[in-house]
Curated annotation (Swiss-Prot):
It comes from Rhodopseudomonas palustris (strain BisB5). Disulfide bonds: none annotated. Its cofactor is pyridoxal 5'-phosphate. Belongs to the class-II pyridoxal-phosphate-dependent aminotransferase family. Histidinol-phosphate aminotransferase subfamily. Its EC number is 2.6.1.9. This is Histidinol-phosphate aminotransferase.
């Protein structure tokens, strides 16, 4: 008997595995530090705006997220007509793949890049080409060496998840200059709000001056609206026009749009999160290094720690040890980092408990 056959590439996809949900010993307080969520939650203004939509849930959203696009435009100094909003930046990444990739095409991602990139690539029948990183950081020369006539997209998370590393804007510009004009460079800036380095740029300048570069961003991280799934893209008019032709007309709900508008206007809430993150990023790096772990320098709201391969000291054993204590970190075997754990920077209490827990774990005979 015949049965439906998925399109080429679909069955080659390894399903995405999100961060673990909290499970601990009975009676223990649980801290989820596996999904890079903010410990401060959304702005109170965003919560109030979200609730204000409750009396009109029978109404469809405005189809282009116009008010939200205008708010983003004001915040970043951008033309709203060159912005697309989506149900998380994941939707926009998939729309870009659907717009520009097909069978026999190729897209390039890096060794430890965001797992949605190969998923979006394979889902459209294209081939995912992996460029090696250097010191857990994107290597522009390695990416350029992988370019072929079949290359249609280069995916670049800057800064990158799960490594927390970034490349300076001069390197991003060098990458764009080295790519053929028909290749779309996708700059995923999900964690840009946490970066304070002088040589970093979110990508707006490059998008504004080329017709083959886009920048995506999200409200899930520093704005604390992950549950509402809101992302956006800034791109050249030609790409925005093409993507809008396949974007669903009501893809961002009214409550989500209202909450996002309020969130982007609350700069004090964002600054509080940014300050907390930077202080704890430095402290965690220092304390975990003292314990005997190797910590990859991070510019994000998480740290990547590397464990020995010695029995009793491994990442898997540390993960189990912490989980029993209600501290849920992210194992990274599916990112080709089996000897590492990623820790979201959480509340003061959660961060202190992780330090104490890992100190106890590493001190075991």
């Amino acid at each position: 008997m015949s049965r439906p056959v998925p399109n080429p590439g679909i069955l080659d996809i390894a399903p995405y595995t999100p961060g673990k949900s909290p499970v601990a010993e009975p009676g223990r307080k649980v801290f989820k530090l596996s999904a890079n969520e903010t410990p401060f939650g959304p702005s109170p203004h965003a919560i109030a705006a979200y609730k204000s939509a409750a009396d009109h849930l029978e109404d469809y959203p405005e189809g282009t997220s116009r008010v939200l696009r205008e708010a983003i435009g004001r915040a970043y100094g951008l033309d709203p007509d060159r912005i697309i909003c989506g149900a998380g930046s994941d939707e926009i990444l998939n729309l870009l793949a659907h717009t520009y990739l097909g069978p026999d095409d190729e897209a390039i991602s890096t060794t430890h890049g965001f797992l949605v990139y190969p998923i979006a690539t394979l889902a459209n029948g294209a081939r995912n080409v992996v460029a090696e990183e250097k010191d857990l950081t994107c290597n522009v020369d390695a990416i350029l060496a992988k370019v072929s006539p079949k290359t249609k997209i280069v995916w670049l998370a800057n800064p990158n998840n799960p490594t927390g590393t970034y490349i300076p804007f001069d390197e991003v510009k060098r990458l764009r200059a080295g790519l053929p004009g028909h290749v779309v460079l996708v700059l995923d800036a999900a964690y840009a709000d946490y970066v304070s380095r002088n040589d970093y740029e979110i990508g707006i300048e490059l998008v504004a001056t080329t017709d083959n570069t886009v920048m995506t961003h999200t409200f899930s991280k520093i704005h604390g609206l992950a549950a509402l799934r809101i992302g956006w893209m800034f791109g050249p008019a030609n790409i925005v026009d093409a993507v809008n032709r396949i974007r669903g007309p009501f893809n961002v709900s009214v409550p989500a749009q209202l909450a996002a508008v309020a969130a982007i206007q609350d700069s004090a809430h964002v600054e509080k999160s940014r300050t907390h993150t930077e202080q704890w990023r430095n402290r965690l790096t220092e304390e975990l290094t003292k314990i005997g772990l190797t910590v990859t320098p991070s510019v994000c709201n998480f740290v990547l720690m590397h464990f020995p391969t010695t029995k009793g000291k491994t990442a898997a054993e540390a993960d189990a040890f912490l989980t029993k204590r209600g501290l849920v970190l992210r194992a990274l075997g599916n990112y080709n980092l089996p000897h590492a754990l990623r820790m979201t920077i959480g509340t003061d209490e959660a961060n202190e408990l992780v330090i104490e827990g890992l100190r106890e774990f590493m001190a075991q005979p």
